Amino acid sequence: MAEQVALSRTQVCGILREELYQGDAFHQADTHIFIIMGASGDLAKKKIYPTIWWLFRDGLLPEDTFIVGYARSRLTVDDIRKQSEPFFKATPEERPKLEEFFARNSYVAGQYDDAASYKHLNSHMNALHQGMQANRLFYLALPPTVYEAVTKNIQETCMSQTGWNRIIVEKPFGRDLQSSNQLSNHISSLFREDQIYRIDHYLGKEMVQNLMVLRFANRIFGPIWNRDNIACVILTFKEPFGTEGRGGYFDEFGIIRDVMQNHLLQMLCLVAMEKPATTGSDDVRDEKVKVLKCISEVETDNVVLGQYVGNPNGEGEAANGYLDDPTVPHGSTTATFAAAVLYVENERWDGVPFILRCGKALNERKAEVRLQFRDVAGDIFHQQCKRNELVIRVQPNEAVYTKMMTKKPGMFFNPEESELDLTYGNRYKNVKLPDAYERLILDVFCGSQMHFVRSDELREAWRIFTPLLHKIDREKPQPIPYVYGSRGPTEADELMKRVGFQYEGTYKWVNPHKL
């Protein structure tokens, strides 16, 4: 058998664009200007600039593309380069291309609420136009407190008159239903829905995007994907590190607003939704909204909140608790861990608990979807059989595997837990997967909104969590302490057991592949 030739990142992304957009979704001859609002910030230097570089390096951006940074700080392109280049992972062979990339960069300093600053920015962009059509893409890498002023000034002063205009908005999209609606109404008064791209980077993850294919391209899953066969669904997001000196920002939002209300709820929608009419953006998002409308507000009896404390045996950061972070307010009751149970009240899912778990300073880095199936009826193996599970692991080491029972090799007729395993690092070992931000920013250039959050999705998501969040903000319940590096509060395990999840602790996964 001939050895499989490794695909380059360019080939992978090129195939992706060809398949999704037939290669002609944007005109290569047009001028495209990518404006990073908040270019001096952490998100810009660690994610946005590196992502634009990767797309530029691999030839995936339109040929006539310019990158303009905008922020209040008095900086130069050289300053931006020094801040962001360490995250580019550029090789010595890529130096000439890197110089070409920064030659297409410029920077404009200005205030976020000053009309004169935006007129200066607009004049700068007009000078870059070379083709008949000029398209502008604004990325708001900014705190939500300045969204209203920035979007108003962009709409009044900086819109292209000869091409399309698109705006990318980063989470958090408000703090609750009221503030989210206020922000959405403001932005919707300035831009059409097809111009607004609310980014949740988890929707750009390989395995999150794979959920639709797994469900709707495999007949074997269709008949069992319902309440008759599935006992519960667990959606997990775990980080092995704490706030690491950035707790002041995190403390304003907490783990529910930061992870559960967006990342985990989006994954829930993809698990629970009905088959869309097409893979078109609005058809997919219509089905997600239908799921959200079937979910009642979270009940406090179905929620566990935790906050990590230092590990007495830990070293370095692990020895510190959340309250030891000097940026965290003294005595803060903000949760760094949350577990919540939701129910999708429709014919397919009635009575099936969807358990959402997320937290910081836990025992591992992991994001996954786990479907646990019901017990086999008519047990003939004397309670030796464990429940089947289908696991979609988003990170690390993307994988799909099924826990199942097989006969243990040998003379005796004993069942044993095993797995059917698709680990991406083994099956696709020569394929380099694009980063989530690469996929999503390429989607914006191509005008595809399938992996972005629509305003009615956002409204329903906040409706589900706002009463709980208001109660937490008002009553400030004391979160349950858990040790840095642990699995989280044992009360969360008890909640999961109460609603029907069975954790046996007997399964030992043996990785047959060396990743």
Swiss-Prot record:
Binding site for NADP(+) 1: G38, A39, S40, G41, D42, L43, A44, K45, R72, Y147, K171
Modified residues annotated as Phosphotyrosine in this record: Y507
GO BP, one annotated term: glucose metabolic process
Record's signal peptide: none
SUPFAM superfamilies for this protein: Glyceraldehyde-3-phosphate dehydrogenase-like, C-terminal domain (SSF55347), NAD(P)-binding Rossmann-fold domains (SSF51735)
Residues annotated for NADP(+) 2 binding in this entry: R357, K366, R370, R393, Y401, T402, K403, D421, L422, T423, R487, Y503, W509
GO CC, alphabetical: cytosol; membrane
UniProt-annotated location(s): Cytoplasm, Cytosol; Membrane
Enzyme Commission number(s) from the entry: 1.1.1.49
PTM entry text: Acetylated by ELP3 at Lys-403; acetylation inhibits its homodimerization and enzyme activity. Deacetylated by SIRT2 at Lys-403; deacetylation stimulates its enzyme activity.
A molecular function (GO) term: NADP binding
This protein's UniProt keywords: Acetylation, Carbohydrate metabolism, Cytoplasm, Glucose metabolism, Membrane, NADP, Oxidoreductase, Phosphoprotein
Associated pathway: Carbohydrate degradation; pentose phosphate pathway; D-ribulose 5-phosphate from D-glucose 6-phosphate (oxidative stage): step 1/3
Binding site residues for D-glucose 6-phosphate: K171, H201, Y202, L203, G204, K205, E239, D258, K360, R365, Q395
Source domain of life: Eukaryota
Membrane topology field: Peripheral membrane protein
Catalytic-site annotation from UniProt: H263 (proton acceptor)
Main location: cytoplasm
N-acetylalanine PTM positions: A2
Swiss-Prot/TrEMBL catalytic activity: D-glucose 6-phosphate + NADP(+) = 6-phospho-D-glucono-1,5-lactone + NADPH + H(+)
Description of how the protein assembles with itself and partners: Homotetramer; dimer of dimers. Interacts with SIRT2; the interaction is enhanced by H(2)O(2) treatment. Forms a ternary complex with ALDOB and TP53; this interaction is direct. ALDOB stabilizes the complex inhibiting G6PD activity and keeping oxidative pentose phosphate metabolism in check.
Family: Belongs to the glucose-6-phosphate dehydrogenase family.
Cited function: Catalyzes the rate-limiting step of the oxidative pentose-phosphate pathway, which represents a route for the dissimilation of carbohydrates besides glycolysis. The main function of this enzyme is to provide reducing power (NADPH) and pentose phosphates for fatty acid and nucleic acid synthesis.
PANTHER family: GLUCOSE-6-PHOSPHATE 1-DEHYDROGENASE, GLUCOSE-6-PHOSPHATE 1-DEHYDROGENASE G6PD
Note: Has NADP both as cofactor (bound to the N-terminal domain) and as structural element bound to the C-terminal domain.
Protein name as annotated: Glucose-6-phosphate 1-dehydrogenase X
Upper taxonomic lineage: Eukaryota, Metazoa, Chordata, Craniata, Vertebrata
